[in-house]
């Protein structure tokens, strides 16, 4: 396939007609404008089927103002197929397995080792990643390098999502209704004992209340993960297998282990069961969706004391319910029995492959890439997040304003984020293109009320810096970013990882609720994991970890050699200059 294709044949089998031309796409060559210019399509309209994740605060992607803006700007229309936050993965996998899948996949990551490397349904993009097609993307990726997006076969099957979000690193947060604590005359808990006592007193104060709210799905909504951290660092869903297999590195032994088989995990289960026996844990915490948790939190009688969420705005809207929003504060991790306070910190720097993929159904990859490249431009993220009307939705370089980092602000958001349903922008749908200087460059009034819509970023930044960052890195459990597996490795553990995660989830819930006695069933639990193939899963992780460690050492050696060579050249140049000067 040619790298710099200015003219491409687009056989749009499901699309019908080019917009307004009366010419079928299947019978016409579609001419593209030069790279980096808009519209992408010189005449008419290209159509692609696009799968992405929908969100409840966006009414209809197809009729959304930003969607229309992109159609007018690029000459490309996306026909959206969507899955919700809780079921997108199942829907996408079903599409891929049934051979009825879209041209492009946006904002959600399929199994690239399976559907890309092995089966070829998702195509390699290496030959298309040129200045002609993706100038903004290449510039944005310069600090990180394209190598990080390569799969085990050395090819690139996706573009990256860049969201170097400080508060997202500490997304596992607990929120507490401070008004209730004040009315009960108690402080924010700092230990497991104090947390238990707060729950007990709350249930006496509000007998029909829910002391701890959580959800099975949602952005950091699993309450048990936050509670387990008081005993041992609980891994998040694996970046490698997309399963909650709890695999991590024990830095004391430099060996891969399953945290769910650690004795500290067992003690965490016992403590959480004591909370369940107290009546502090709502049964729905283990099964409900994030939306159902939101409904629970927002009931008229305000029944919830504690709830887990990556951001309070996922649960309470500051605009429509400002007083209730102000009742809640973020609280720091609590200390476990040994006195250790552990804060979860994601191992991922905020740059992830899998954000935009093109399938072999797509007849014009160049056009699809030029469409997505806008998102990597200076204003792409602003337009998708907040709307495309400069001066109304946002402004660049606002005079006299400072960012979260205290430096001159790069932009100011005028159309603030809202949890209420709207149809002007995409907000969190699609991809984020937000490097650190961009995130920290958002204009913030230093005196802003952090309990207002305008103060959300500062609220999350301050909570992360003051309450969570001090307790990060205090555990001997080290979490992994994505490990690149070979196709064989991925195939060998794909079923194992699911079975291991299912056993951990089902048995852990049984332990926490008392359906199973953890003391009598602990050995049986570990045996069932081994029978499911846990040791094979650990072995694959260990091998991948060894490969990544070798790669890090090679990279470090290469960088050192390059620095030495540069220093030598500089010294030689200096010597030559001194010789010429002396002459």
Where is each model-derived feature located?
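Bacterial N-terminal signal peptides that target proteins for export
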Residues: 1-9
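Conserved N-terminal structural module of periplasmic/extracytoplasmic solute-binding proteins
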Residues: 8-10, 23-194, 238-247, 251, ...
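Bacterial N-terminal signal peptides
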Residues: 11-20
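Short alpha-helical segments and helix-capping/turn motifs at coil-helix boundaries
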Residues: 33-36, 87-94, 109-110, 142-145, ...
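Loop/turn elements at helix/coil->beta-strand transitions in domains of secreted/extracellular proteins
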Residues: 44-48, 74-79, 99-103, 120-123, ...
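Conserved small-residue motifs centered on glycine
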Residues: 53, 379-506
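Helix-loop-helix "hinge/cap" segment bordering the ligand-binding cleft or interdomain interface
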Residues: 126, 153-226, 249-299, 356-393, ...
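Extracytoplasmic/periplasmic substrate-binding proteins
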Residues: 220-246, 273-441
């Amino acid at each position: 396939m040619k790298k710099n294709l200015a003219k491409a044949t687009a056989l749009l089998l499901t699309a019908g007609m080019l917009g307004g031309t009366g010419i079928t796409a299947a019978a016409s060559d579609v001419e593209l404008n030069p790279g980096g210019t808009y519209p992408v399509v010189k005449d008419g309209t290209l159509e692609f089927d696009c799968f992405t994740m929908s969100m409840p605060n966006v009414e209809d992607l197809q009729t959304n103002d930003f969607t229309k803006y992109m159609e007018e700007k690029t000459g490309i229309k996306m026909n959206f197929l969507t899955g919700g936050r809780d079921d997108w993965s199942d829907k996408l996998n079903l599409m891929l397995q049934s051979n009825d899948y879209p041209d492009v996949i946006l904002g959600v990551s399929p199994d690239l080792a399976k559907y890309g490397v092995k089966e070829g349904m998702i195509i390699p993009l290496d030959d298309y990643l040129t200045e002609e097609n993706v100038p903004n993307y290449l510039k944005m990726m310069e600090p990180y390098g394209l190598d990080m997006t390569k799969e085990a076969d050395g090819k690139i099957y996706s573009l990256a999502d860049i969201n170097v979000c400080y508060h997202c690193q500490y997304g596992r947060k607990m929120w507490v209704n401070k008004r209730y604590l004040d009315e009960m005359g108690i402080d924010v808990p700092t230990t497991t004992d104090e947390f238990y006592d707060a729950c007990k007193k709350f249930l006496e104060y509000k007998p029909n209340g829910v002391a701890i709210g959580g959800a099975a799905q949602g952005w950091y909504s699993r309450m048990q993960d936050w509670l387990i951290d008081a005993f041992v660092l609980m891994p998040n869903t694996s970046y490698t297998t997309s399963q909650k297999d709890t695999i991590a590195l024990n830095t004391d032994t430099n060996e891969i282990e399953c945290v769910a088989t650690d004795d500290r995990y067992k003690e965490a289960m016992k403590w959480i069961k004591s909370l369940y026996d107290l009546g502090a844990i709502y049964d729905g915490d283990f099964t409900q969706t994030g939306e159902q948790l939101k409904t629970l939190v927002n009931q008229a009688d305000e029944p919830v004391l504690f709830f887990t969420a990556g951001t309070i705005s996922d649960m309470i809207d500051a605009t429509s319910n400002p007083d209730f929003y102000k009742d809640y504060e973020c609280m720091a991790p609590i200390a476990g029995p040994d006195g250790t306070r552990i804060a979860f910190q994601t191992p991922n720097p905020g740059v992830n492959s899998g954000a935009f993929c093109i399938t072999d159904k797509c007849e014009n990859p160049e056009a699809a890439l030029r469409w997505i490249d806008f998102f990597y431009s200076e204003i792409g993220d602003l337009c998708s997040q907040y709307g495309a009307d400069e001066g109304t939705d946002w402004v660049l370089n606002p005079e006299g304003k400072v960012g979260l980092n205290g430096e001159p602000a790069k932009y100011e958001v005028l159309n603030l984020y809202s949890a209420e349903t709207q149809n002007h922008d995409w907000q969190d749908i699609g991809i984020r293109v937000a490097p650190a200087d961009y995130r920290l460059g958002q204009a913030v009034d230093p005196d802003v009320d952090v309990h207002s819509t305008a103060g959300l970023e500062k609220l999350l930044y301050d909570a992360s810096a003051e309450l969570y960052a001090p307790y990060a890195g205090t555990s001997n459990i080290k979490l992994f970013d994505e490990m690149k597996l070979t196709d064989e490795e991925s195939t060998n553990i794909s079923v194992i990882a699911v079975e291991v995660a299912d056993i951990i989830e089902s048995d852990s819930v049984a332990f926490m609720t008392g359906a199973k006695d953890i003391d009598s069933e602990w050995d049986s639990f570990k045996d069932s994991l081994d029978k499911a193939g846990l040791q094979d899963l650990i072995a694959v992780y260990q091998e991948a970890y060894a490969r990544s460690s070798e790669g890090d050492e090679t990279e470090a050696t290469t960088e050192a050699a390059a620095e030495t060579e540069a220093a030598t050249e500089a010294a030689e140049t200096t010597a030559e200059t001194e010789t010429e000067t002396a002459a």
